[in-house]
Amino acid sequence: MRGSSWLCLTQLGSLLLLALAASTSAGAEIQAADCARAAKYSESKRGASMLVMQNGRTIFEHHYANGGSAGGRWPIFSGTKSFWGIAALAAARDGLFKLDDPVSDTITEWKNNPRKSQITIRELLNQTDGIEGASRLQRPSIRDRNAMAIRLSAVAEPESAFIYGPSHLQIFSELLRRKLKGRDVIGYFEARVSNRLGLGGLNYKKDARGNPLPATGFELTAREWARLGELLLGRGSYHGRQIVPAALLREAFAGSHVNPSYGLTFWLNQPAPTAREADMERMLDLHWQDAQWTNVCICKDAPADMVVGLGSGYQRLFVIPSLEAIIVRQGSSARFSDARFLRLVLGRIQ
């Protein structure tokens, strides 16, 4: 099932889950005492910072530990991807493309490839395009990541597998560069996304050609990362300014049939509460052919409308629309459980 048919079904399912989450969670207040217990757990797992906001106000901020500080930026690693996902939606709003356009309309080198010619922009963003993940793209010695990315092999048919890696957004970066016709990709990102969120001095990990590495690189304070959460809760609006239309933003929260727990650069909790809880980072350590992404969730006791920005080492931005809540957790690699942490924050562990 490709493109629009699957999208219609997943959007309908998403709306039903949102309604259910709203009916079961409306009015629920996160308690500072529960947050303190979660912070203690996080700190014991090398947590550096924690921030909880609800209904537009800060209700808990961790007394920073393990090298963290309120004003010190911390690597969010793959949490970077979600910012570029917002940039993709902004570009769609600007009319540069439609999400279901074939990539080969722009990257014409793919026209005669039986697999690559079928790939859509949406499939780049939800990592179901079948292109190898190519973690080697992150090496700083590569002179032109975009050129390398578009030459990568398609190891599976489009929409037949979820293959996580930096390749997909690197290809998107090249597509956006061509669509901008001489305008700078980073300049576009800053004008449409980061400047509007008040974020400057970002590390784009540029290669020798000036191409950004959209898969990773940003360093943010907990408060800065929470601004992306405010944008999501604002249905694409931040401090009264619409960055992406609400209807387009909803498309980012629709999973694919091969991985219902991943949308357009955002992780999803939609399969909860009946799904199997999984540590997404450990799942990503598996070879793509060995990972089973159907019927998994981040936390069965968290609302099904929760969306997540996820970075290595358990960097997390949890956004729960039904609770009007934003939860940021930053730290160093350790054996950390998202599910336990969320149960503590939400008061589901007595």
Where in the sequence are the language-model features?
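Bacterial N-terminal signal peptides
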Residues: 10-21
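A short, well-structured edge-of-sheet supersecondary motif
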Residues: 38-68, 317-320, 324-328
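Active-site SXXK
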Residues: 56, 74-100, 124, 172-176, ...
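Short, charged, amphipathic alpha-helices and their helix-cap/turn boundaries
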Residues: 58-62, 104-105, 134-158, 164, ...
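Active-site helix/loop module of the DD-peptidase/beta-lactamase fold
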Residues: 75, 93-131, 180-216, 220
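Conserved catalytic neighborhood of penicillin-recognizing serine enzymes
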Residues: 110-139, 151-160, 167-170, 220-223
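Active-site-proximal alpha-helical segments within enzyme catalytic domains
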Residues: 171-175, 217-237, 315-329
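Active-site Gly/Thr loop motif
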Residues: 199-202, 255-326
